[in-house]
């Protein structure tokens, strides 16, 4: 059964996979990524008090290894909001000639490049690739990525740029292949926009203050036990990121006393396909329900497509040992 579900500020396509799940639906890899800033964030007040040298030291790598961007943005101080700080950096990059922008993207290391030297990539970039999983691909996928990187450089003489933390592995590959058909002007414009997303997230995790940009989304669930007409407290929920015929666990949680669960919060919701797995049989077994052997429903799966990394997606489920449904 295919359903469409809208949320407060997001959109997802949901497919309910009904019936009993025997074993794992897909080959699995478990990677519970914990993105976030490495150092304690600065305050906007501290940023506005910096001299030029301190400002460039703090933001010289926001646009990867390009302190000139920070030097230009420094002239816009004081920044009334964190959003204004990021916009000043983006405006500094956007104001230079197209040739200089291309040179910036040309110097970037290729996505997933295992041979890149430490001085040619920032810690932030390494973290972003780690969270998306492109630094730990299978050998087959790594070879596929190497070929795409070469084809992209051969055509555009630039490194392929995408906001890793806003996209799943599957979406990164899809976008890579799709964007190879673009012309240079289109591709440069897309690369600049993706760099905007990358740097906005970096600034938001580096500085706290007034007017924070929205860079995180949230995926939540609410499960009701229709047998007793109460919230389902203690149901295990796993979230898998789908790529081809494999699944990668990216979150795990348990519903609270109100039947609610924060599945993916405090980070962008990467564009891509997902599968929620609700351990329904285990939950009702603990409630003392008489279940068949095997139970009618074991693990219930709900498939989603997320396409708003900063959106709010809520998945409400009503269930019994013999039925389940989405509700609004």
PLM feature segments, named:
Residues 66-73, 160, 315:
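Residue-level signal for inorganic ion chemistry
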Residues 153-188:
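Long, amphipathic alpha-helical coupling/dimerization segments that relay conformational signals between
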Residues 2-19, 26:
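N-terminal secretory signal peptides and thylakoid transit peptides that target proteins
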Residues 31-35:
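Boundary at the C-terminal end of the N-terminal hydrophobic targeting segment
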Residues 44-49, 57, 61, 68-148, ...:
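Aromatic-anchored, charged helix-turn/loop surface patch used as a conserved interaction hotspot
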Residues 192-213:
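Charged phosphate-binding loop/patch that engages nucleotide di/tri-phosphates or the phosphate backbone
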Residues 307-328:
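Compositionally biased low-complexity segments at domain edges in trafficked proteins
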Residues 212-308, 314:
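Beta-strand-dominated extracellular/periplasmic modules and repeats
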């Amino acid at each position: 059964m295919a359903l469409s579900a809208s949320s407060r500020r997001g959109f997802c396509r949901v497919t309910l996979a009904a019936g009993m799940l025997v074993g794992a639906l897909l080959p699995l890899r478990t990677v519970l990524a914990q993105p976030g800033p490495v150092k304690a964030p600065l305050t906007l007040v501290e940023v506005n008090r910096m001299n030029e040298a301190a400002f460039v030291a703090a933001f010289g790598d926001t646009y990867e290894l390009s302190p000139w961007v920070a030097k230009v943005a420094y002239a816009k101080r004081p920044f009334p909001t964190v959003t204004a700080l990021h916009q000043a950096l983006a405006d500094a990059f956007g104001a230079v000639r197209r040739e200089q922008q291309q040179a910036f993207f040309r110097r970037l290391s290729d996505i997933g490049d295992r041979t890149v030297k430490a001085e040619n990539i920032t810690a932030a970039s390494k973290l972003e690739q780690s969270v998306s999983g492109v630094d730990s691909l299978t050998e087959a996928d790594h070879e596929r990525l190497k070929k795409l990187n070469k084809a992209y450089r051969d055509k555009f003489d630039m490194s392929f740029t995408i906001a890793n933390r806003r996209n799943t592995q599957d979406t990164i590959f899809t976008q890579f292949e799709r964007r190879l058909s673009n012309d240079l002007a289109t591709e440069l414009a897309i690369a600049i926009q993706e760099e905007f997303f990358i740097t906005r997230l970096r600034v938001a995790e580096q500085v706290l203050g007034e007017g924070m940009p929205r860079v995180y989304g949230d995926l939540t669930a609410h499960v009701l036990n229709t047998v007793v007409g109460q919230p389902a407290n203690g149901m295990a929920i796993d979230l898998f990121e789908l790529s081809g015929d494999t699944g990668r666990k990216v979150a795990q949680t348990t519903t609270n006393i109100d039947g609610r669960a924060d599945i993916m919060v405090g980070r962008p919701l990467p564009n891509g396909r997902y599968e929620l797995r609700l351990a329904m049989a285990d939950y009702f077994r603990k409630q003392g329900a008489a279940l068949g052997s095997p139970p009618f429903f074991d693990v219930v799966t709900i498939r989603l497509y997320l396409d708003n990394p900063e959106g709010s997606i809520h998945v409400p489920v009503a269930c019994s040992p013999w039925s389940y449904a989405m509700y609004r």
